[in-house]
Amino acid sequence: MSLQLSMFAPKSEWVPPHELPDLSNCKQIAIDVETRDPNIKTKGPGWPTGDGMIVGYAIATENWAHYIPIKHVGGGNLDELIVNRWLKKVFESPADKIMHNAQYDAGWIRQSGFTLNGKLIDTMVIAALLDENRFSYSLNALSYDYLNKTKSEKELNEAASAFGIDPKAEMWKMPAMFVGPYATDDAKLTLDLWNYFSVQINKQGLSKIAELELNLLPCLIDMTWKG
């Protein structure tokens, strides 16, 4: 299936990174994956069974952030072999790996053949420790409430409307240039949230509980993987 570029689609100046930097000295790396997960609403996430695929990776560090598309049906992808060689180094580095809903992202990364080293941190888990009575723990809601920031969804939604597709469930069909800014924001906001939350954890005396919760994440992923 291939989408024709709609004459009504908004203009986008976004392009994927021209080169992939050396992140070996980074202490924290935020990661978000964009996926094709066709049966998530009926069968749950597809990563334990390989039902779907990652179409792109958003990576954010203190000094660099970008979206790296590899399998968008609409085009604009980077060479997957080159990207995978770089990602292997990133994922296997000792840096803390920060995600929002880490079981999903880390699960898909595992399904894609990578090993994640370093401490796994989930900002969704930490948010629940800090405030167990919230209505929403979505990345956008948390970012708005704690950071006064939100994701840039306008261009994504306008493009999806022009193509006649669902901006979230069918994001994989779109040209990467319309997904790039949105996906990059996912990773950047996740990193910003963790930088804020890490201070609040110490202030509220929750460090030991947070450590316990985060240490459970790899076990939960293993259990889901093995069924």
Role assignments for model-derived ranges:
Residues 208-227:
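Extended, well-ordered alpha-helical scaffold/bundle regions in very large, multi-domain proteins
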Residues 1-41, 83:
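N-terminal accessory regions of nucleic-acid-interacting proteins
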Residues 45-50:
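Short consensus segments that form the blades of beta-propeller domains
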Residues 42-44, 94, 167, 208, ...:
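Sparse, context-dependent recognition of short Cys/His-centered cofactor- or disulfide-binding micro-motifs
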Residues 2-12, 52-55, 59-202, 220-221:
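Active-site-proximal helix-loop-helix substrate-binding element of RNase H-like nuclease domains
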Residues 27-29, 53, 217:
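Residues at beta-strand starts and edge strands
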